């Protein structure tokens, strides 16, 4: 999610707020405490405590800052995942300085974190797995153990193995969805016991991609073309459908960030996914969910918590239109009309 370009959209489009279509406004939390510089937040819960994991290097020199809260509003720093980038990643991807896009879930009596490594603008990337018995940093059992490589992409591949998201379908099968630029969002089946790739189903499923405009500009030297900008996939199951959330356009450029979050849905986890108008996501479809307002730019890098009684949450980052600084934001999801609606802080 760190690396991404795109030709600018018209500013008027960026000022749309997709949640306006909802008959019942979602609740947008007013956050305080340590919420700045929280890229690609992944939210989960252990006991009564909420935890958010974020991309990148920590002030202490480690990787993946952890923030925690008891009420979803007041947040503090409560540790980091790794003290340093694992040696095997440094050997496999020399020059890697940050680890990206953590995705944390609780499966098979352990917390699993899928995460990515890469270099800016390249698809020589990989997705790895770390596990922990607890998220409580005060517990004697607290220790993140790196399980190594899950999936990688090479320069000759048409996909980019970053931005992982774990999903267990309603039949109990585990999947890993991922992708950034190139040919878009992909999916592989996982082995349920190990969390690694399935050896019985090696299919690389295609879920979503951007459509090439007729006036597309040539790709910058050594970089993918701007029109390919789709990444940060996240899938949830709701009301008989799988909903695929992705981030489009430009991330991580402060006041020039043009990220926005879009969504489509399918009856089967492997697709085909369509947007609210029926346009396939493999043909560039996507219904806007989060787009900029006058105060916050580039909302994206989302993760979702599906709670009891439809108490569902979406967490993401956005950029302060005054300072260009990124910050974490949090909204409930309103499912009016069987499509999600969420909001930004005013």
Each model region followed by its residue ranges:
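Bacterial N-terminal signal peptides
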Residues: 8-18
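Bacterial N-terminal signal peptides that target proteins for export
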Residues: 1-9
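Compositionally biased, low-complexity segments
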Residues: 4, 18-21
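Carbohydrate-active catalytic/glycan-binding domains of CAZyme proteins
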Residues: 23-346
């Amino acid at each position: 999610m760190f690396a991404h370009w795109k030709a600018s959209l018209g500013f008027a489009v960026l000022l749309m707020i997709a949640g306006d279509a909802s008959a019942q406004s979602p609740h947008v939390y007013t956050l305080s405490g340590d919420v700045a510089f929280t890229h690609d937040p992944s939210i989960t819960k252990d006991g009564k405590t909420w935890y958010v994991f974020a991309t990148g290097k920590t002030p202490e020199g480690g990787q993946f800052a952890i923030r925690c809260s008891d009420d979803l509003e007041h947040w503090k720093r409560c540790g980091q995942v790794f003290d340093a980038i694992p040696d095997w990643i440094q050997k496999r991807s020399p020059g890697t300085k940050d680890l990206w896009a953590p995705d944390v879930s609780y499966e098979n009596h352990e917390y699993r974190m899928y995460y990515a490594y890469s270099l800016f603008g390249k698809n020589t990337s990989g997705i790895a797995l770390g596990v922990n018995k607890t998220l409580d940093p005060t517990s004697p059992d607290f220790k993140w153990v790196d399980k190594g490589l899950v999936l990688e992409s090479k320069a000759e591949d048409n996909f980019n193995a970053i931005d992982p998201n774990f999903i267990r379908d309603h039949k109990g099968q585990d999947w890993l969805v991922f992708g950034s630029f190139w040919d878009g969002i992909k999916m592989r089946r996982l082995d349920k016991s190990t969390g690694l790739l399935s050896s019985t189903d090696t299919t690389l499923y295609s879920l979503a991609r951007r459509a090439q405009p007729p006036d597309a500009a040539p790709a910058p030297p050594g970089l993918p073309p701007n029109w390919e900008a789709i990444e940060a996939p996240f899938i949830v199951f709701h009301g008989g459908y799988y909903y695929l959330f992705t981030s489009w356009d430009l991330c991580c450029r402060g006041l020039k960030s043009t990220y926005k979050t879009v969504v489509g849905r399918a009856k089967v986890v492997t697709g085909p996914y369509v947007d609210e108008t029926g346009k396939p996501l493999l043909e560039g479809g996507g219904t806007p969910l989060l787009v900029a307002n006058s105060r916050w730019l580039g909302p994206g890098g989302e993760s979702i918590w599906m709670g009891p009684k439809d108490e569902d949450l979406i967490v993401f980052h956005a950029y302060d239109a005054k300072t260009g600084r990124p910050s974490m934001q949090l909204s409930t999801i309103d499912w009016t009309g069987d499509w999600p609606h969420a909001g930004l802080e005013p």
